[in-house]
Amino acid sequence: MSLPIVLVDGERTAGVPATDSSVLRGDGCFEAIRAYAGKPFRVDAHLDRLERSAAALDLPVPDRSLIASWIREVAEEGGDCLVRVVVTRGP
């Protein structure tokens, strides 16, 4: 089993701060994107849904192209994997 690849705001890190609203209140939304041979599946559809979910919760979302680049980075390294994108309000 390989270790997970974790990016927080595009930076490799072990996780989110304990003061993050997702930890304290469960405040956030996510998308899970399957990748096959390092290629994420239907990224645009997933990002559309993520943006709708975040808007419904009034959560700030990083630039779409930036999120897509992070997804591609993780998928390329992970190969056949699941890429989970989580949006929170932050600390």
Model-flagged regions — what are they?
Residues 1-91:
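Conserved alpha/beta cores of soluble small-molecule-handling proteins
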